[in-house]
Amino acid sequence: MKYLNIKKALTAWQELQPLSEKDKDRLSRRFTVDFNYNSNHIEGNTLTYGQTEILLLFGKVIGEASLRDVQEMTASNVGLRMMTEEAKVKETPLTQNFIRTLHRTLLREDYTVYRNGQYKTRPNSVITRYGDRFEYASPEETPSLMADLVDWYNKAEQEGKLSPVELAALFHFRYIRIHPFEDGNGRIARLMVNFILTRHDYPMIVVRSRKKSEYLEALHQADLEVGPVPSDGAHADIKDIRPFLKYFNNLVATEVYNDVLFVSEKNENVWWYDGERIAFRTPNYTKILNAMRTEPTLTLADMREITGISIAAIQKLLDQLIQKKYVERGEKDGSWRVFMTQ
């Protein structure tokens, strides 16, 4: 079953409300890992999905990881919580100070990042996938363009002519065309998208790093329609960014639909990993996964006793789970870690 449009996905989501506390917690834990992993992975963070889960949910570092990547991921989660709390105060208008504070949180001094929380003082640009250099707003025009962006957002939100999805997509596009900071602009943009959706009681979404090319291509196609002048991009209209809006609508519909499935589907052989629904054809996978989650220190012989599956079959299934990075065995203590959720 697939939703043909975002309206159907949102209707299905609303029909599930109010969620139980258990389902809220399940969604929160899943989103925390998915969002932080993907948003940072897009920008080059090297922590694996499993490392991210253990770090954010249990406060531990497993395997080899750079200090910078660990600190970056931890700060990202602090920023996510800050954004979520701020979005709940719906009567408070958006301010530049909040965006700068969010940036300061993501790129703290212990990362030795230059000018965290302050707008750029030197030009920034990007080399596109097609080899072209694309210039963002100059340092001189950035403060006024950011003032325009925040003023436009608050006015547009009050007027209500744009849907929350249109508002979030257009804010993202305008913000990226300004690129106000010297680093961290993509991560801020993805946080602000969820800030806007949360303010309007929409589920939060994840831009998946495995689909980074689709994300960047949609922005590129919208750039072609708007043109290369930074101030034009910073003041773009919703009709000007049709390629990105189409992408964004599909993204929101897909993410909401997956949330609906995650909450409502009752199938013990269906698991989730980084936004993907994994339906195992045999219940033996579920037997093994549940056994490892219940008792992480199980040996193969223990698994055989609990599941009734032969050791040879268990080893084959484990090899497949490990290859997909759904599970991992600790090098020091030999305990199993399951990175799939239900």
Which residues fall in each region the model found?
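FIC/Doc superfamily catalytic core
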Residues: 1-183, 187-342
